[in-house]
Amino acid sequence: MAAPQPLALQLEQLLNPRPREADPEADPEEATRARVIDRFDEGEEEKDDLAVSSIRKLAPVSLLDTDKRYSGKTTSRKAWKEDHWEQALPSSSDNEASDEGGSEDGDSEGLGLEEISEDVDEDLEDNKISDEGGSEDGDSEGLGLEEFSEDVEEDLEGEDEEDREEDRNSEDDGVVAAFSSVKVSEEVEKGRAVKNQIALWDQLLEGRIKLQKALLTTNQLPQPDVFPVFKDKGGPEFASALKNSHKALKALLRSLVDLQEELLFQYPDTRHIVNGAKPNTESEEISSEDDELVGEKKKQRKAPPKRKLEMEDYPSFMAKRFADFTIYRNHTLQKWHDKTKLASGKLGKGFGAFERSILTQIDHIMMDKERLLRRTQTKRSAYRVLGKPEPVPEPVAETLPGEPETLPQGPANAHLRDLDEEIFDDDDFYHQLLRELIERKTSSLDPNDQVAMGRQWLAIQKLRSKIRKKVDRKASKGRKLRFHVLSKLLSFMAPIDHTAMSDDARTELFRSLFGQLNPPDADRGK
């Protein structure tokens, strides 16, 4: 049936005298009305895949309502085994017990074993009442029952074996999963530690690069022999600047000492250097109890005690601190040298110098201390120290045109002779660090790996796109002249006329070329 029309539409149709136009496509019958179907069968489904009828859907419900044999409940394998073994089939007394148990727990058993035992008991009673032939039949029935019980036992044994195998497999899978998860977590932690170490090294190197400019500026300061002259001629302005710089340097030195003490105090193996206690050399590893004690101590004492030292006390204090730290430094260097040596697997191969201990090699290099100090006191950069006269350049001999220019040749090691005990210049070590940084950044990518090279190229393009170009937006539409300043002409000279012809002779020559032989004065007189 069609849906009822609203009251407003019915009233409008009644008040409108104009007859309605019937739609030829409209179908008043509901059975033949065009409808949108929910599903369209294109013949792709198989013919056997038919829908379940309503009778089959109601069949299980009706069977459960009519017969209790089809009723059941969800149970586990273990509970089913216990219930199954409780039903002993060979003896009649057990059958009677099973009958009593079946009458009490008939609703809880859903596997049909109770009905089988009842049928067997009835057959046994019938066999006792019957004749000898019947007794023979009963014996055969008893044999069949024994065979049935044996089959059930074999099935249960097979299921037990399957359960044991499943348990073993699950245990093995759990052990393997736990082992693999531990390995993966360890590798992840190692990777994070290495990443943090590389990031820390990059930050330290960045700080060293920023300190290079300050080091060059420090080397240009006036030295002690001419410093009083600068102080006298500088006046109060120089004195105030000197006082402020002294305070800033003192605060910086205290901050660096506090940072060093904080770092040494946080690590258990170096805490004795700050506390002044004896180092614990019994065990290198730290147990969980020690970690808890360390955490409690940190809560009680978050930082080492602050030291108030004067400027005169810092040299002796730093010398003592360095001597105390040397023991831990040597132990750490030797430990990691041995680990890397074992990991490389090149024991007993190579030169004899590499077979020596790392501490022996360091001591051998530090033996010539005077040479190392001279290397740091050698001026390697081009800068002028205030208060010292500028070096006078050597005069260059004049050369005539056509002769080759000769430059003055100095000794090969002239730059090494420029020694100054009041400066510290390690440009060679600084440039070595820069070279290693550039090599590490550039050689980290495999040249054959096109994907990695493409990613690097995209990163470079992204950085280039971030750079803002300086564009003069007011110079468009002719509002501003655009011009390029030409460079000055160098070695330019006007041409010199070396001809012997005078200007009058040159004029007469050109006039004769065009047929005008009269001189210009005669033309003017006419």
From Swiss-Prot:
Per the record, its GO cellular-component terms are: cytoplasm; cytosol; nucleolus; nucleoplasm; nucleus; small-subunit processome; transcription regulator complex
Identify this protein by name. Answer: Protein AATF
Which GO biological process entries does UniProt record here? cell adhesion; embryonic cleavage; negative regulation of amyloid precursor protein biosynthetic process; negative regulation of apoptotic signaling pathway; regulation of mitotic cell cycle; ribosomal small subunit biogenesis; ribosome biogenesis
Please name the gene that encodes this protein. Answer: Aatf
**What are the alphabetically sorted keywords of the record?**
Acetylation, Nucleus, Phosphoprotein
Q: How does it assemble?
A: Part of the small subunit (SSU) processome, composed of more than 70 proteins and the RNA chaperone small nucleolar RNA (snoRNA) U3. Interacts with POLR2J, RB1/RB, RBL1/P107 and RBL2/P130. Interacts with PAWR and SP1. May also bind MAPT.
Q: What is the lineage of its organism?
A: Eukaryota, Metazoa, Chordata, Craniata, Vertebrata
Q: Tissue range of expression?
A: Expressed in adrenal gland, brain (Purkinje cells), heart, kidney, liver, lung, muscle, ovary and testis (at the protein level).
Protein family according to the UniProt entry: Belongs to the AATF family.
- Residue ranges with Basic and acidic residues bias: 30-40
Q: Where is this region: Disordered?
A: 13-51, 63-175, 274-307, 388-410
The organism of origin for this protein:
Mus musculus
Keyword Acetylation in the entry? The reply is yes
Q: Where is this region: Binds POLR2J?
A: 240-282
